[in-house]
Amino acid sequence: MTTWDKCLKKIKKNLSTFEYKTWIKPIHVEQNSNLFTVYCNNEYFKKHIKSKYGNLILSTIQECHGNDLIIEYSNKKFSGEKITEVITAGPQANFFSTTSVEIKDESEDTKVVQEPKISKKSNSKDFSSSQELFGFDEAMLITAKEDEEYSFGLPLKEKYVFDSFVVGDANKIARAAAMQVSINPGKLHNPLFIYGGSGLGKTHLMQAIGNHAREVNPNAKIIYTNSEQFIKDYVNSIRLQDQDEFQRVYRSADILLIDDIQFIAGKEGTAQEFFHTFNALYENGKQIILTSDKYPNEIEGLEERLVSRFGYGLTVSVDMPDLETRIAILLKKAHDLGQKLPNETAAFIAENVRTNVRELEGALNRVLTTSKFNHKDPTIEVAQACLRDVIKIQEKKVKIDNIQKVVADFYRIRVKDLTSNQRSRNIARPRQIAMSLARELTSHSLPEIGNAFGGRDHTTVMHAVKAITKLRQSNTSISDDYELLLNKISR
């Protein structure tokens, strides 16, 4: 077995089968001592391989062969002249070191480029041009009949399970619905549409559905993908003349999960294919789960017929977790990593990182790594020092009176209206929002917040926080207002 054969086995584990067959299998790698030449068939193919898979190829060859090596990327098939880019990786070379470019011409003075063969199967002008672009000939075409491993979609990640998803008021409805469809797919909430900002746990919930459904029914056919991969699969099925297989695979799923569905908006061919796929699955009682960064009606360029179908089932939101949930997320994450995190440090990070869960966990990792490297406990002082440029710690904390002023200006009412006894909706709702913001953005206790709003009882503040949290799940207008106010006050 050659070094490259060993590498292929490792690379295959890191890619979807379809991606592996489309991009990695067609290339040829020749080894001459420490020199590895990667033949990529044409310039476009070479650039794509190098930009998307270059680091994976380099690290895998280093793992199988050692660090002292040279990699050449050729834009030709395995013969004749070569135009190559050379990557040198020695014992002291940085993994992400700058590549040097070397032009080699080993075919005397000729610069003739061999034309790729065009499949006799296709009479389509578009397909022929795509063949010329990608450099595929008939021998490279992959069909389900020729290869049983031909597949679509993306692998589910085992780490995304319901047990590792921290539940709070901002996501409990979405989590409950996700659990229901994983146990009884196609029965309730079909489709299940989960929307919310980036990094708030939509992908986690979606993959948790797939992983749990597989535990409940190991024989279920579950396809997980995102809109980018769905588009790639569709385009590749056209290029490889295998649309029937694309349709057969996607329309035979028991559970179809598509992340970031908003990106199919404006892509007419893909949107139409998805429309028919949706109808086929829905009519057969198969479960569909979709995520998006926006409510269906707010996705610009999305066809009305798709918007209406997304409304067939249940639409739920995931919002930024409140302070208590953010603290719980940090403590659980630290525990999962086998690290001790003081409650006060978790509270400090949670109070200062309010963008999304992804950045919250990133801040935690930075604190834990810094403290471990410096052989110190992860104290507030350590967090303050290493996160200063990330969270832009302000010397003055947000004050309740500032929140009241911003909210009053936003809703065009007076600050004294917020502290008054008026109960009209145009006053009561902004007051509840201001209380909820005060609870999230300040360290004041419930009684202190109530006192700042005209001497109200702490139970009134609790009711306001719960009411606004619930409304943010179902009312996009209030949810958008809240996020906008949150950003204004946090600046």
Swiss-Prot record:
Residues 155-371 are annotated as: Domain III, AAA+ region. Keywords: ATP-binding, Cytoplasm, DNA replication, DNA-binding, Lipid-binding, Nucleotide-binding. Residues 1-69 are annotated as: Domain I, interacts with DnaA modulators. It is found in: Cytoplasm. Residues 69-154 are annotated as: Domain II. The keyword Transmembrane helix does not apply. CDD domains: AAA, Bac_DnaA_C. GO terms for biological process: DNA replication initiation; regulation of DNA replication. One of its GO terms (cellular component) is cytoplasm. The keyword DNA damage does not apply. Residues 372-491 are annotated as: Domain IV, binds dsDNA. One of its GO terms (molecular function) is lipid binding. InterPro entries: AAA+_ATPase, Chromosome_initiator_DnaA, Chromosome_initiator_DnaA-like, Chromosome_initiator_DnaA_CS, DnaA_C, DnaA_dom, DnaA_N_dom, DnaA_N_sf. ATP binds at G199, G201, K202, T203. Oligomerizes as a right-handed, spiral filament on DNA at oriC. Belongs to the DnaA family. Domain I is involved in oligomerization and binding regulators, domain II is flexibile and of varying length in different bacteria, domain III forms the AAA+ region, while domain IV binds dsDNA. Plays an essential role in the initiation and regulation of chromosomal replication. ATP-DnaA binds to the origin of replication (oriC) to initiate formation of the DNA replication initiation complex once per cell cycle. Binds the DnaA box (a 9 base pair repeat at the origin) and separates the double-stranded (ds)DNA. Forms a right-handed helical filament on oriC DNA; dsDNA binds to the exterior of the filament while single-stranded (ss)DNA is stabiized in the filament's interior. This is Chromosomal replication initiator protein DnaA.
